[in-house]
Structure formats: C-alpha cells, structure tokens
From Swiss-Prot:
Localisation: Cellular thylakoid membrane
Membrane topology: Single-pass membrane protein
Protein name per the record: Photosystem II reaction center protein L
Organism: Synechococcus elongatus (strain ATCC 33912 / PCC 7942 / FACHB-805)
Similarity annotation: Belongs to the PsbL family.
Gene behind the chain: psbL
Function: One of the components of the core complex of photosystem II (PSII). PSII is a light-driven water:plastoquinone oxidoreductase that uses light energy to abstract electrons from H(2)O, generating O(2) and a proton gradient subsequently used for ATP formation. It consists of a core antenna complex that captures photons, and an electron transfer chain that converts photonic excitation into a charge separation. This subunit is found at the monomer-monomer interface and is required for correct PSII assembly and/or dimerization.
Length: 40
C-alpha cells in the first residue's frame, strides 16, 4: 500500500467500498442459499 502515506483520505473510502461489496455479496449468497432451501 504505497498510497497510504501519501493519500490518507483515500484509504477509508476504499475500505468502506470493500466492506460494502463484501456485505452485498454475503447478502446475495445468503439469499441464494435460503431460496434454494425453501424451494427444495
């Protein structure tokens, strides 16, 4: 991470974007698992 010392304001934005993406991916996977579980 070479841009951490030069751009301290860019790191939290990327972390929030990554956490948001992981959260949406987790909800998407859980939705698929629950839908397949209920349809079976």
């Amino acid at each position: 991470m070479p841009t951490r010392s030069t751009n301290p304001n860019k790191q939290p934005v990327e972390l929030n974007r990554t956490s948001l993406f992981l959260g949406l991916l987790l909800v998407f996977v859980l939705g698929i698992l629950f839908s397949s579980y209920f349809f079976n």
